[in-house]
Structures are given as C-alpha cells and as structure tokens.
C-alpha cells in the first residue's frame, strides 16, 4: 500500500505469513473484534435500560458505539483476510464498498466526538436555553447530520478510486485524494474538536474557581439599587445559578435516576418572579439557610460532575487522537514520499487505529460510575439467569 512495487505484487504478501504467524494474528484480531462488539453492545444496552443514562445526549454514545460495531463486522474481517492472503478475493464491487465503509466509519467516529464536544460546550455556555432544546428528537437530527457529513467525505473512493485490478484492492493514490481525505476525515475535525474542548476546559476552570453567584455580582449590585427590585427591604428571590430552573439542576435531573427533594423548589413566585410579602412567615429564615446550604452542596456536586464529564471527554478524545494520528500522519506523508514509510510500520499504524473501537467502553467503565453500575447490572442479570 506504500510503494508501488509492493502494491502491484499483492501475492508476495502470502510469503510473509507462515502458519506460526498467521494463526496468532488471526486469534488476536478475532479477539479484538469480539471485544469491540461485546463492549459496544453493552454500551447500547446500558443507555437504553439504565435510568441514569437516559439523558438525550447519551444517544451520541449509542451512535458512536454503533459505528464501532460496524467497523468490527463490516471492515475488520475483510482487512484481516486481505492481509493474511495477500490478495483480494471478494470481488471488485465489494472492494469499493469496503474501502468507502472504512472511511465512513472512521470519519463518523471523529465527527461524533466533534458533536459531543459542541453539545457539551453549548450545555455550559447556554445552560437553560440549550438544556430546554436538548430533546431526543434534536439529538437524533444532529446524529443524522453527522452521518451525512461522514458519508459525503467517504464518497470519493466510490467515484475516483482506481478500480480493483485482479486480486488487488487499493484506494486511489493520487496526492489530491490522500491529502483531502486525511484533512476531511481527521485533521480538520480533530482541530475543531480540540479547540472546542480547550474552550470547555477554560470555562469549567473559571466556574470551579468562582463560588455560586459570584459570576452575577455586578448584576446583583445593580439590582440592589433598583426600587422595583425590592419590597420593604427584601431582595427578590432569584436562582443562584443559571443551570437551575425552580431550584432543579438541569443536568442533574437529566443524568440521575434519584429524585431530589429540595426545599428551594418549594418557593412560590408571583407572575413576575417576585416573592410575595404575605408568603414570608416566621421560621422562614431557617428554610432560607437550608435552601442556601442545599444550593451550595448541589453547586459543589455540579462542579464535580462537570469536572468528571470534562475529564472523560478529554480521555475519549485523547485516546482517539493517539490511536489514529500515526496512521493519518504517515498516510499523508506517503502522498509526498511514496516509499519513505516502511510498509510494516504503516500496517501497524493501520491496525492500531482499529484498536480505538474497543477502548471507549473501557473508558466509560473506568471513569463513569453510571456506566459501571449499569454494566454490572446487565452482566449480573445474565449470571443469575444462568444459575437459575
């Protein structure tokens, strides 16, 4: 795939793999395929069966897991067969489809990560507005657009590739295609994703440093001098954080399967959002203190949850880049120096990228309590049924 001599003589590859090499390689790739399918099916089941994971944004993870499953079932087995046999024996039509699917699923994975990053960014910068708009239907539309973008990028192999000749299945090696496909499938989405994530990190860092309500000091200071905002010296009741609606944390309500009883949510407001004087009774001071304590503790919990989510997102993005960057870098390099990259190294990077499809379920298990609990429930149920 790197040098013209090697590409045009695919039958030579059969001499490279003896039975002692082909058998362990087949077992290793076979186990990798099973791990990818098992782990990602587990993710899909967990999202649809666990109340803690039914938040609309987790549909992104379902679609991402589906892309990884498709890689394991429609791409990797044929890549393994082509590698071991040193020739393509599945026909010219399937060769074209296979190459397009390979690009499609890889591109879909990184565009999903871009969408997840943007979703997280909007949920932080436009908390109330975006959380109200973040419905399953809206997320499904975004996922559909993600797949359309990936499909558009993966179409050129079907149109411009050199048709498979004999037992060779290889993509178009024209410089313009290599460069454009690498930019569209990896480098551009990767840059967007990293920039968005850096912005997310900066915002999360600022909010972690500021105690509740500090980001609204100026607004509150202005309102204290406004006679319309006071009633007999009593300041109007306002939520202390834009992530709350009637005392309910938007993200907490969407990601937790426990109902939280909050005294702050029991406050009644007039049509203009002002607290009525007749509603203030003796003993309300204790309730106010309890309300403030509840809000402060919930604020700390929300900050910890944002940190964890941001960290998990960083790990997923980082692992994806680590797995696929070597391949795309060397593949782009071949456009300018066809024989400068050793074929063995290129093949290693090629298969190393596929390993990424098995890692997301492991990341969720290690860093996300909800997924870990859901996986345990799913697996324990199966064990109990076997015992019975």
From Swiss-Prot:
* Superkingdom as given in the UniProt entry: Eukaryota
Q: Which SMART domains match?
A: 7TM_GPCR_Srsx (SM01381)
Q: Which residues are glycosylated?
A: 6, 9, 12
As for membrane topology, the entry says:
Multi-pass membrane protein
Q: Where is this site: Implicated in catechol agonist binding and receptor activation?
A: 181, 185
Q: Which GO terms describe its molecular function?
A: alpha2-adrenergic receptor activity; epinephrine binding
The annotated region (Disordered) lies at 208-291
GO CC field: plasma membrane
Q: Which residues lie on this side of the membrane: Extracellular?
A: 1-22, 86-95, 163-173, 338-344
GO term, biological process aspect, one: adenylate cyclase-inhibiting adrenergic receptor signaling pathway
Gene3D superfamilies according to UniProt: Rhodopsin 7-helix transmembrane proteins (1.20.1070.10)
Q: Composition bias, kind Basic residues: at what positions?
A: 266-275
**UniProt protein name:** Alpha-2A adrenergic receptor
């Amino acid at each position: 795939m790197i040098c013209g001599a090697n590409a045009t003589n695919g039958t030579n590859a059969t001499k490279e793999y003896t039975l002692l090499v082909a058998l362990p390689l087949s077992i290793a790739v076979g186990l990798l395929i099973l791990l990818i399918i098992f782990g990602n099916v587990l993710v899909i089941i967990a999202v649809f069966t666990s109340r803690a994971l039914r938040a609309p944004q987790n549909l992104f993870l379902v679609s991402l897991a589906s892309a990884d499953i498709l890689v394991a079932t429609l791409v990797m087995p044929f890549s393994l067969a082509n590698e071991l046999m040193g020739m393509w024996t599945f026909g010219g039509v399937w060769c074209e489809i296979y190459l397009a699917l390979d690009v499609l699923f890889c591109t879909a994975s990184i565009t999903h990560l871009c969408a997840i990053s943007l979703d997280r960014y909007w949920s932080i910068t436009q908390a109330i507005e975006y959380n109200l708009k973040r419905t399953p239907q809206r997320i499904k539309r975004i996922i559909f657009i993600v797949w359309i973008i990936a499909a558009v990028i993966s179409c050129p192999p079907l149109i411009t590739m050199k048709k498979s000749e004999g037992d060779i299945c290889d993509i178009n090696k024209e410089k313009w295609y290599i460069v454009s496909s690498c930019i569209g499938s990896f480098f551009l989405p990767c840059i967007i994703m990293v920039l968005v994530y850096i912005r997310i990190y900066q915002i999360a860092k600022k909010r972690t440093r500021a105690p509740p309500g500090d980001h609204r000091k100026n607004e509150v200071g202005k309102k204290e001098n406004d006679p319309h905002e006071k009633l007999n010296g009593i300041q109007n009741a306002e939520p202390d954080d834009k992530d709350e609606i009637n005392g309910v944390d938007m993200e907490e309500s969407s990601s937790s399967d426990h109902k939280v009883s909050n005294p702050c949510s029991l406050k009644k407001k007039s049509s203009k959002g002002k607290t009525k004087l007749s509603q203030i009774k003796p003993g309300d001071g204790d309730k106010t203190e309890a309300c403030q304590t509840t809000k402060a503790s919930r604020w700390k919990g929300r900050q910890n949850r944002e940190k964890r989510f941001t960290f998990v997102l960083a790990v997923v993005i980082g692992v994806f880049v680590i797995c696929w960057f070597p391949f795309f870098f060397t593949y782009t390099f071949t456009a300018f120096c066809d024989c400068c990259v050793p074929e063995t190294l290129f093949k290693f990077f090629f298969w190393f990228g596929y390993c990424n499809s098995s890692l997301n379920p492991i990341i969720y298990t290690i860093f996300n309590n909800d997924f870990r609990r859901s996986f345990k429930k799913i697996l324990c149920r199966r064990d109990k049924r076997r015992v019975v």
